């Protein structure tokens, strides 16, 4: 994974810089996300790693993407195809999203709770995280009944485990040591 990120970073950075210059960050994020989904498609994967000529591969990929990818996005796809790097398009999209979130002072937070959170509870969690992180927070909420009660919050490098199962695991570790 680290190798894919290393390969994808210059493409993501170049695309992000271009998007900033042209005031098109959101449209580029959508375009790269769509292209990444195409590259991850099971019928497309063998073509990306096969021996297809770069020009034909780029033309095929662009035709599959259709109007979802603009001229500049097509140019990125052509350059990546010429360099044999289309298989890292998902990593490019992921890095681009990270650059966009950093630029917009946003962070995506994953909240896993034992029961479904009400919209009021989600709002409280969001406000608390925004204060703590000094960023706008976008919550992705899910449920996991194995937590027993409480929640686990992941936002970037921050992990807050307030679940009962987590507390029991920590207590068990302390008792065993």
Swiss-Prot record:
Q: Which PROSITE patterns does this UniProt record tie to the protein? A: ATPASE_DELTA
The record's similarity note reads: Belongs to the ATPase delta chain family.
- What highest taxon heads this organism's lineage? Bacteria
Subunit structure as annotated in this protein's UniProt entry: F-type ATPases have 2 components, F(1) - the catalytic core - and F(0) - the membrane proton channel. F(1) has five subunits: alpha(3), beta(3), gamma(1), delta(1), epsilon(1). F(0) has three main subunits: a(1), b(2) and c(10-14). The alpha and beta chains form an alternating ring which encloses part of the gamma chain. F(1) is attached to F(0) by a central stalk formed by the gamma and epsilon chains, while a peripheral stalk is formed by the delta and b chains.
Q: Which SUPFAM superfamilies has this protein been placed in? A: N-terminal domain of the delta subunit of the F1F0-ATP synthase
Q: What is this protein called?
A: ATP synthase subunit delta
State the organism named in the record.
Shewanella denitrificans (strain OS217 / ATCC BAA-1090 / DSM 15013)
Q: Name one GO molecular function term.
A: proton-transporting ATP synthase activity, rotational mechanism
Q: Which NCBIfam families match?
A: ATP_synt_delta (TIGR01145), PRK05758.2-2 (NF004402), PRK05758.2-5 (NF004404)
Where does the UniProt annotation locate this protein? Cell inner membrane
Q: What is the lineage of its organism?
A: Bacteria, Pseudomonadati, Pseudomonadota, Gammaproteobacteria, Alteromonadales
Q: Which residues form a coiled coil?
A: none
Print the keywords alphabetically.
ATP synthesis, Cell inner membrane, Cell membrane, CF(1), Hydrogen ion transport, Ion transport, Membrane, Transport
Which Pfam families does this entry report, sorted A to Z?
A: OSCP
Protein's job: F(1)F(0) ATP synthase produces ATP from ADP in the presence of a proton or sodium gradient. F-type ATPases consist of two structural domains, F(1) containing the extramembraneous catalytic core and F(0) containing the membrane proton channel, linked together by a central stalk and a peripheral stalk. During catalysis, ATP synthesis in the catalytic domain of F(1) is coupled via a rotary mechanism of the central stalk subunits to proton translocation.
Bilayer topology reads: Peripheral membrane protein
Q: Name one GO cellular component term.
A: plasma membrane
């Amino acid at each position: 994974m680290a190798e894919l990120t290393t390969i994808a970073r210059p493409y993501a950075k170049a695309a992000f810089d271009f998007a900033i210059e042209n005031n098109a960050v959101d449209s580029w994020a959508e375009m790269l996300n769509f292209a990444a989904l195409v590259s991850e498609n099971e019928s497309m994967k063998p073509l990306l790693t096969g021996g297809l000529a770069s020009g034909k591969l780029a033309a095929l990929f662009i035709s599959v993407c259709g109007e979802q990818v603009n001229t500049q996005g097509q140019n990125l796809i052509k350059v990546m195809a010429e360099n044999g790097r289309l298989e890292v398009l998902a990593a490019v999209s992921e890095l681009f999203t990270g650059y966009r979130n950093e630029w917009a002072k946003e962070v995506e937070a994953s909240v896993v709770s034992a029961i479904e959170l009400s919209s009021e509870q989600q709002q409280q969690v969001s406000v608390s995280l925004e204060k703590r992180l000094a960023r706008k927070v976008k919550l992705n909420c899910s449920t996991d009944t194995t937590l027993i009660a409480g929640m686990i919050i992941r936002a970037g490098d921050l992990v807050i485990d307030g679940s009962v199962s987590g507390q029991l695991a920590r207590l068990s570790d302390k008792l065993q040591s």
